[in-house]
């Protein structure tokens, strides 16, 4: 009769910002299952392609790791060309029956490009060089846009402050923040 009951895993807020040729991507560390916090210090960001690209994930962890592995393969296959690798991953995501069932999103930054690869296989390049995914993404995005527009803060500082704001508002986001920079 109805849908299968599947545990709802909410696990993050990931935010990336590019400013003045420098990129930063960070995430909180909380992983929850339903209304229970499972872990406070989950690492959800990784440096890829010889340290030239940073990616973070939101969604089901096993699904996200599968997508990260596939994305890394695409980066290697296309010589580190971020957009090409993202489009090829999205193409696979849409056409592969196994990948279509994965419940995850990726946020990806290089020094000059920010992309979101959505759970539907879309590649989105935001106009303002800010990427945000996960349960607290809209809070972090709003904070980052304001800080980018009205302060001289660095990309790293904007990511840090914005994730702290999201952690104050979103119950699925904590203040155990990890940030990587390019």
UniProtKB/Swiss-Prot annotation:
GO CC entries: HslUV protease complex; proteasome core complex
Location relative to the cell: Cytoplasm
BP terms from Gene Ontology: proteolysis involved in protein catabolic process
Catalytic activity line of the entry: ATP-dependent cleavage of peptide bonds with broad specificity
Keyword set includes Metal-binding: yes
Activity regulation as described: Allosterically activated by HslU binding.
UniProt keyword list: Allosteric enzyme, Cytoplasm, Hydrolase, Metal-binding, Protease, Sodium, Threonine protease
Enzyme Commission number(s) of this protein: 3.4.25.2
CDD domains: protease_HslV
Entry annotated with the keyword Protease: yes
Domain of life: Bacteria
Residues at the catalytic site: 12
Pfam families reported in the protein's UniProt record: Proteasome
Binding site for Na(+): 167, 170, 173
Gene3D superfamilies for the chain: Glutamine Phosphoribosylpyrophosphate, subunit 1, domain 1
GO molecular function: metal ion binding; threonine-type endopeptidase activity
NCBIfam families, sorted: ATP_dep_HslV, PRK05456.1
Quaternary context: A double ring-shaped homohexamer of HslV is capped on each side by a ring-shaped HslU homohexamer. The assembly of the HslU/HslV complex is dependent on binding of ATP.
Family: Belongs to the peptidase T1B family. HslV subfamily.
Task performed by this protein: Protease subunit of a proteasome-like degradation complex believed to be a general protein degrading machinery.
Protein name: ATP-dependent protease subunit HslV
Organism in which the protein naturally occurs: Chlorobium limicola (strain DSM 245 / NBRC 103803 / 6330)
